[in-house]
Amino acid sequence: MYKQIFLCLIIAALCATIMAEASALADADDDDDKRYVRGMASKAGAIAGKIAKVALKALGRRDS
């Protein structure tokens, strides 16, 4: 149980870090750069979510 909680906290921290870095990078003057960085952030968030789902499923199967 503690492993799952710890894993969720790590994933949440990584997602928050990724999103914070992406918004900091989006402060450039070009609108194209902003769109590109925001696109990268949404893709990174989607990938992190998929990884979290797979990890939680793997932990659930292992505990059973």
Curated annotation (Swiss-Prot):
The UniProt keywords, alphabetically, are: Amidation, Amphibian defense peptide, Antibiotic, Antimicrobial, Cleavage on pair of basic residues, Cytolysis, Fungicide, Hemolysis, Secreted, Signal
Q: Does the keyword Secreted apply?
A: yes
Question: What is the disulfide pattern of this chain?
Answer: none
Please list the residues that make up the propeptide: 21-35, 60-64
Tissue-wise, where is it found?
Answer: Expressed by the skin glands. Synthesized in the stomach and stored in a novel granular multinucleated cell in the gastric mucosa. Stored as active, processed peptides in large granules within the granular gland secretions of the skin.
| Biological processes annotated in GO | defense response to bacterium; defense response to fungus; killing of cells of another organism
The principal location of this protein is: secreted
Signal peptide interval: 1-20
Signal as a keyword of this entry, yes or no, is yes
Residues modified to Leucine amide: 59
UniProt-annotated location(s): Secreted
Q: Which GO terms describe its cellular component?
A: extracellular region
Q: Record's superkingdom?
A: Eukaryota
Instruction: Quote the function comment for this protein.
Output: PGLa and PGLa-H display a broad-spectrum of antibacterial activity against a range of Gram-positive and Gram-negative bacteria. PGLa also displays antifungal activity against C.albicans ATCC 14053. PGLa-H shows moderate antibacterial activity against the multidrug-resistant methicillin-resistant S.aureus (MRSA) but exhibits very little hemolytic activity.
Q: Which family does it belong to?
A: Belongs to the gastrin/cholecystokinin family. Magainin subfamily.
Q: What is the protein's name according to its record?
A: PYLa/PGLa B
Where does this protein come from, organism-wise? Xenopus laevis
